Design a protein with these regions (language model features):
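Conserved beta-strand hairpin/beta-sheet module of binuclear metal-dependent hydrolase folds
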Residues: 3-60, 132-150
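Short, hydrophobic/aromatic-rich segments at coil-to-beta transitions
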Residues: 9-14, 115-121
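Short Gly/Pro-enriched turn/cap motifs at secondary-structure boundaries
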Residues: 22-24, 121-126
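Active-site HxH/HxHxD metal-binding segment of metal-dependent hydrolases
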Residues: 22-27, 45-116
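Short, acidic/polar N-cap/turn motifs at the starts of alpha helices
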Residues: 29-31, 109-110, 130-132, 171
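Active-site neighborhood of phospho(di)ester-bond hydrolases with catalytic His/Asp-centered motifs
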Residues: 43-45, 67-77, 93-95, 122-125, ...
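Metallo-beta-lactamase
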Residues: 49, 128-197
Length: 197
């Protein structure tokens, strides 16, 4: 089965562009918003200077916290998840389940579709539980990769990755399908031959 989303009807925006220069002490997550049909999806609502960096851009689009239907967590590091509680009514998705209120449903993220245009795939490497969100828009396939890449320049060798070979294999898998990559802590960039592996 191809990783490419079957649909091309979704739209996305980056709510706030994160940063990192090393392994600390400062870091901010790149937080993104995807919409497709009735779904309003926030990806990696992590560390930011203020919650307004997430809620403000949503409000500018007419979307309140309670309107968000789904949150996808690329992995369970606090810098990518710390503001998930802003969206208490949403379904939370990770590598192994969907959570809502006080219930969860086990399911593997691999190939799970939120819609035909929004697909999850497992991409371990930065952590053993990494998930990438592949989004089919009318113009491109956009990959929200969490920390497979922290920013456009890598880092090539992730200093916290438990398995660099798996990281590289997951990066290659994403590059085989994506036109645009949204990293965990920086601006979006083209998925081309300049991307560090």
């Amino acid at each position: 089965m191809s990783d490419t989303p079957r649909g091309r009807t979704a739209d996305y925006t980056i709510l706030t562009t994160g940063y990192t220069t090393s392994t600390g002490p400062g870091v901010a997550a790149t937080v993104s918003y995807v919409t497709d049909g009735d779904l309003h999806i926030v990806i990696d609502p992590g560390m930011v200077a203020s919650r307004d960096r997430i809620l403000g851009p949503l409000a500018a689009r007419g979307v309140g916290a309670d309107d968000v239907t789904d949150v996808v967590l690329s992995h369970h590091h606090p810098d990518n998840t710390i503001n998930a509680g802003l969206f208490g009514r949403a379904r939370m998705h990770d590598h192994k389940a969907v959570y809502q209120a006080d219930q969860w449903t086990d399911r593997d993220a691999e190939g799970h579709e939120l819609t035909p245009s929004v697909r999850l795939i497992r991409t371990p490497g930065h952590s053993a539980q990494d998930v990438t969100v592949l989004v089919g828009t009318p113009d491109a396939v956009v990959a929200f990769v969490g920390d497979l890449w922290w920013r456009p320049d890598g880092p090539v060798e992730d200093p916290v990755a438990p398995d660099l070979a798996r990281l590289r294999a997951s990066r290659e898998r994403v590059l085989a399908v994506a036109d645009v990559i949204v990293p965990g802590h920086g601006p979006a960039f083209a998925a081309d031959e300049a991307v560090p592996l």
